[in-house]
Amino acid sequence: MKRESFRSRLGFLLVSAGCAIGIGNVWRFPYIAGKNGGGYFVLFYLLCLLVMGVPVLTMELAVGRASRRSAVLSYKTLEKPGQKWHIHGWFCLLGCYLLMMYYTTVSGWMVSYFGKFLTGAFHSGMSTDEVASAFGAMLSSPGEMALWAEVVVVAGFLVCSFGLQKGLERVTKVMMLCLLVLILVLAVHSLTLSGAAEGMKFYLVPSMDSIRENGFGSLVTDAMNQAFFTLSLGIAAMEIFGSYMSDEHTLPGEAVRICALDTFVALMAGTIIFPACFTFGVAPEEGPALIFQTLPPVFINMAGGRFWGALFFLFMIFASFSTVLAVFENILAICMDTFGISRRKAVLINGILIAALSLPCVFGYNIWSDFRPILGKDVLDSEDFLVSNLLLPIGSLVYLLFCVMKWGWGFDKYLAEVNKGTGIKLSPKLKPYFQWVLPILIVIILLQGLL
């Protein structure tokens, strides 16, 4: 069977960026940037992206493009006879399932809140406490949460059932272009608010006071972690798109473009959030509390609040759903390649499977609220711990070692693949850095997540 491929370079870039752009761009990046000295953090974050994120991203893409296969078979195609690197491909599949077990639930929250603003369930007559308490009410309702999570699952697999070009690429291109327009409209509106200057000063103006208060170590570790995790590396979510791309352009250039889009959205998210928070005297937070408890009352209290709230959550739906589609495609590709089944059959099997696997996260906030499977964490945080603290860093280390060590694919073959085509090329002089320094940095991130 002929390998599917992207219709255009723009399709590849937007789908890959859509995989990277997710909820963390909005509920984590702006907060830690403001906390860690604003502009200083952004500069250090960009440096970490270049020295860590871009190299590992090129490795996932290179394995995919050289093999023209998904996770398991890509290793089998490139590894030497008798080697077992392909075992990691199964852990990539496990990581994708685990990620979707909670990401579909959180994406469902976005859909629910979009509906609340659109239908007027949130309106200007409500008190701040009433709006903020709606989040707890939603979490305590397994029926409401399950409904929206399953809507996300069905919609995601429906799109993917149409194939790469007619499904994933076509829908993601429209979503990502709408996302970029929405984020610009929301950012421009936030900059017209009375607290815009104060909010942007906290967010981006370099501040040594913040660094002294939180410590330089906090800046370094937060920048490293954010640069690493924002790209969702280590579970083959990017590798699959390498297998669909052409040989016309070098991988370092494409990786830089993907990172630039991801960073643009993260920076613009802060431009939306901080002026609004400072205008209405609300302390910026991070995580779900920011999106579902801090910001909705802010929108309700501003002129045209229902409209701006609905636009914001539509933007959040696009950000989260682009990741859902990308990971669903990876799951389907692994199943189709490895087991030789049709796309339609893979969609049916995995749709039912992920619909069922999403329920523990839903129930973890209500009927299973006492269930704390890992280190006293609830179900969602336990699933996220396994993905973010174990599978992503360990998986990235495996891809790195496979690409640069002679007992893997080998640095020379990796270098030839990444430099194929026109664009930015990697120098062979980077070999010592890739073989010795970069693995140590990834191990540091792994240990930070476990300690």
Segments predicted by a language model, with ranges:
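C-terminal membrane-solvent junction of multi-pass transporters and transport-like membrane proteins
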Residues: 88, 339-351, 382-442
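Membrane-interface "cap" regions at the ends of multi-pass membrane proteins
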Residues: 1-27, 56-61, 65-87, 246-250, ...
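Loop-to-transmembrane helix boundary motifs in multi-pass membrane proteins
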Residues: 5, 11-13, 19, 146-147, ...
